[in-house]
Amino acid sequence: MALQIDVPDAPKHGVLICGHGSRNRLAVEEFEGLAVGLKQRLTGFPVDYGFLEFAQPILRDGLENLRAQGVEKVLAIPAMLFAAGHAKNDIPSVLNTYSAETGLKIEYGLSLIHI
């Protein structure tokens, strides 16, 4: 079932799924499948994804894709089981730097352990 939300006169929101990345191609493909599934469910929002390391696209690529679609505010969701160093420090650092450089508003969500 798709979730369709329309909010008139609100900034255009998008969703960025943040992954760690892997050198294992099958792991990367599984993560890409997660992003595709979310795109199908969140039909009212542009959805993209990126990896912190070891795989493409990187987080900045996903953010650029969302900006190119007119997104003004991003909800970045770490798709990690635990809020370890990457989820607590590295991903927020990339997001904060990108936001400071471009002015894009980015809210950072909780790791999957909190759900």
Predicted regions and their residues:
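Conserved small/polar residues in nucleotide/adenosyl-binding loops
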Residues: 113-115
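Short, well-structured alpha-helical segments in soluble
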Residues: 61-69
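N-terminal glycine-rich anion-binding loop in soluble enzyme alpha/beta folds
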Residues: 2-62
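Short helix-capping segments at alpha-helix termini
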Residues: 40-43, 98-104
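Short, high-confidence coil segments that cap the C-terminus of an alpha-helix
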Residues: 44, 71-72
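Short glycine-rich or small-residue beta-strand-to-loop segments that form or flank ligand, phosphate
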Residues: 15-21, 48-50, 74-81, 107-109
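Conserved phosphate/oxyanion-binding catalytic-loop motifs
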Residues: 74-101
